[in-house]
């Protein structure tokens, strides 16, 4: 039986997000639909993905998250406010921000913390590419960056039209997506970012949208009953260790040998730099990488 993992996101996700100004979540909902004066605006981005969006929108920040990943050059020397999952509230408060921009996957944990230091927060959704562009559109309206947002939306629409055109008429493969952590793995549904990419690529997730849950845990017998054509293996963290774990699991657990996807050589390890936990501007490269996996084409 599948068990929904209602609390797993706070343990797994470093930064994923939904934001459209019409449906933005913050401590003061009555304020979100009104544009703000950007001349003296003080913003803090608490995840790398949010910082990338702010950079593309040409927004200045006063603080940014600590990360081992890449931050836009313009933000590298800013005050660091800690990791995405656990920002330093004392540092945040000292920056006197007008808004703190954070992932809505962490809203249940972060919103009461932000409220405790009386800072406004906007929670964004990067669980899907569409959510990311809704976020961009909303931020553009709120922070007087509609021109920049419109250019990015046009870029997205153009890419997706061209991408989908080349798959017209092709049969949709059934796909099982596994998300690995060192020592364990779970199922990623199409409600997760990796699952969303598979859906955009034209694949059919054998676990659907998980009734809105990004991740499920299921036994291998249940997975086998779904008869996936393709198995994709992604890593939440420590990709080298996870890849070794998956290799050992598929080699030593006899049931995998009975999956048609395994028998047909349709098991693929995803590049963790493209297939991570939150939507970002590498989605186009990720979709191109999926093309030969799903359709056997280069």
Q: Which residue stretches match the model-derived regions?
A:
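Bacterial N-terminal signal peptides that target proteins for export
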Residues: 2-12
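C-terminal motif of bacterial Sec signal peptides marking the signal peptidase cleavage site
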Residues: 20-23
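Basic- and aromatic-lined ligand-binding clefts that recognize polyanionic substrates
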Residues: 40-57, 148-202
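A short, structured surface patch at a secondary-structure boundary
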Residues: 44-95, 99-105, 206
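Proline-aspartate-enriched helix->loop->beta-strand connector
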Residues: 88-102, 119, 219-233
């Amino acid at each position: 039986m599948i068990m929904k993992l209602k609390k797993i996101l706070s343990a797994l996700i470093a930064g994923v997000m939904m934001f459209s100004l019409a449906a933005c979540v913050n401590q003061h909902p009555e304020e979100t639909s009104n544009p703000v004066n950007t001349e003296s605006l003080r913003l803090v981005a608490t995840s790398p993905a949010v910082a990338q969006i702010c950079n593309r929108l040409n927004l200045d920040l006063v603080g940014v998250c600590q990360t081992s990943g890449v931050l836009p050059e313009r933000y590298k020397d800013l005050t660091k406010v800690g990791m995405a999952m656990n920002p330093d509230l004392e540092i945040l408060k000292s920056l006197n921000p007008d808004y703190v921009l954070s992932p809505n996957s962490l809203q249940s944990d972060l919103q009461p913390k932000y409220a405790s230091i009386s800072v406004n927060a906007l929670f964004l959704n990067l669980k899907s590419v569409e959510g990311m562009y809704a976020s961009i559109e909303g931020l553009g309206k709120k922070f007087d960056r509609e021109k920049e947002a419109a250019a990015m939306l046009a870029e997205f629409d153009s890419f997706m039209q061209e991408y989908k055109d080349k798959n017209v008429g092709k049969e949709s493969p059934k796909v099982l997506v596994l998300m690995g952590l060192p020592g364990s793995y779970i199922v990623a549904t199409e409600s997760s970012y990796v699952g969303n990419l598979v859906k955009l690529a034209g694949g059919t997730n054998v676990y659907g949208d998980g009734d809105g849950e990004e991740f499920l845990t299921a036994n291998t017998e249940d997975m086998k009953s779904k008869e996936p054509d393709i198995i994709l293996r992604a890593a939440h963290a420590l990709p080298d260790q996870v890849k070794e774990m998956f290799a050992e699991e598929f080699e030593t657990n006899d049931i995998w040998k009975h999956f048609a996807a395994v028998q047909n050589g349709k098991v693929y390890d995803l590049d963790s730099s493209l297939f991570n936990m939150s939507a970002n501007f590498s989605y186009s490269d990720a979709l191109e990488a999926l093309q030969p996996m799903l359709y056997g084409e280069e």
